[in-house]
Amino acid sequence: MIAKLMYPVVDCPDPAALAGFYARILDWEVDASDPEWVWLTSAAGQRIAFQEAKDHRPPRWPDPEFPQQFHLDFEVDTIEDVERAQREVMALGAEFLHDSGGERKGFRVFNDPAGHPFCLCYGQSL
């Protein structure tokens, strides 16, 4: 091993707002003591950082002219759970992009408020 992963860092125009969006999904704590670098931390100590990027150009998945830089996958158990989760993330400001279909296993793609794609996956452990 050359190194250990510390945490992902997400570029965005408003770190506090985007960290707040993901905090509501994950139920993690936000540390916005530095407005240009905001932390999201789980009870177990996992972290995601959100860094201000004034010139942030959001991706437009699946448009190759504006490709995604990364995406996060979140897991729920069943299609019923993904239905509930979809309503909740959209109420937080997510934009629905794609449904892979599948009654027992699949994923749905959304944009977060800064334009980064993320997925709600279900049935992955079947």
Task: Report each predicted region and the residues it spans.
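Glyoxalase I/VOC metalloenzyme domain signal
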Residues: M1-M6, V10-A32, S42-E95, N111-L126
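Short hydrophobic/aromatic beta-strand element in the GNAT-like acyltransferase core
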Residues: W37, F107-V109
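Short, small/polar residue-rich loop motifs at catalytic or cofactor-binding pockets
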Residues: E103-K105
